[in-house]
């Protein structure tokens, strides 16, 4: 069952730290690594007053795409304080090597709808793919309806962070430890984790819907 998921799934990470390890592991299993980098995007790196920061996912289509991902990541974390804007993203862009996706959570749609931001990203240099999900969160349906205003054919996806629903508390504990901040103490009762209130981000949930 896990192999079935791996053959159909994509690995999306917030950094490139685990890329080489992931490539080695998939090669050992005879699988093709389909890798995406989730990164923050802002309207303008020059505008220090801009409060709009949202997530995008950039997938590498080939080896050249991996090189471009590395350049984008390096720029964002050396000159962009962890983010990139349209001007600099377009500089490294190639539709032949990269694919841009708008994730369901933490995207500009999410930020505008649920956090009253005013994000106006410029994706004119490419054609993004929009994702939707259903993880039994109270705002999933509202957000999905809003996504449909930007894209008539979004792709249904599933974020998987742990194996079984019973592993949710262990995952939550891990995230609390990783996100410790001196000024904002995290606990299981108050983990300070956005939309971390569902046990549906599991492989078990995906299998129930796809392996019947």
Report residues per predicted region:
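Cofactor-binding loop segments of dinucleotide-utilizing enzymes, especially the Rossmann-like FAD-
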Residues: 38, 61, 103
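Solvent-exposed, non-transmembrane amphipathic alpha-helical segments
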Residues: 62, 86-89, 180, 190
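Covalent nucleotidyltransferase
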Residues: 48-57, 63-72
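Catalytic cores of large soluble enzymes that bind and process phosphate-bearing ligands
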Residues: 14, 58-61, 135-139, 205-212
């Amino acid at each position: 069952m896990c192999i079935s998921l791996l053959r159909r799934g994509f690995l999306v990470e917030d950094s490139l730290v685990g890329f080489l390890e992931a490539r080695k592991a998939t090669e050992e299993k005879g699988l093709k690594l389909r890798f995406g980098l989730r990164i923050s995007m802002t309207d303008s790196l020059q505008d220090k007053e801009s409060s709009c920061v949202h997530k995008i996912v950039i997938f590498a289509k080939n080896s050249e795409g991996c090189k471009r991902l590395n350049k984008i990541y390096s720029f964002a974390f050396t000159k962009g304080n962890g983010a990139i804007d349209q001007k600099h993203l377009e500089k490294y862009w190639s539709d032949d090597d990269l694919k841009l996706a708008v994730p369901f959570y933490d995207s500009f749609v999410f930020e505008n709808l649920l956090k009253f931001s005013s994000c106006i990203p410029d994706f004119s240099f490419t054609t993004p793919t929009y994702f939707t999900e259903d993880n039994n969160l109270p705002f999933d349906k509202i957000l999905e309806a809003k996504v449909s205003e930007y894209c008539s054919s979004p792709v249904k996806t599933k974020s998987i962070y742990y194996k079984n629903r019973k592993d949710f508390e262990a995952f939550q504990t891990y995230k609390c430890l990783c996100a410790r901040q001196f000024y904002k103490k995290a606990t299981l009762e108050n983990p300070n984790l956005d939309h971390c209130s569902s046990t549906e981000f599991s492989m078990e949930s995906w299998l129930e819907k796809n392996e019947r």
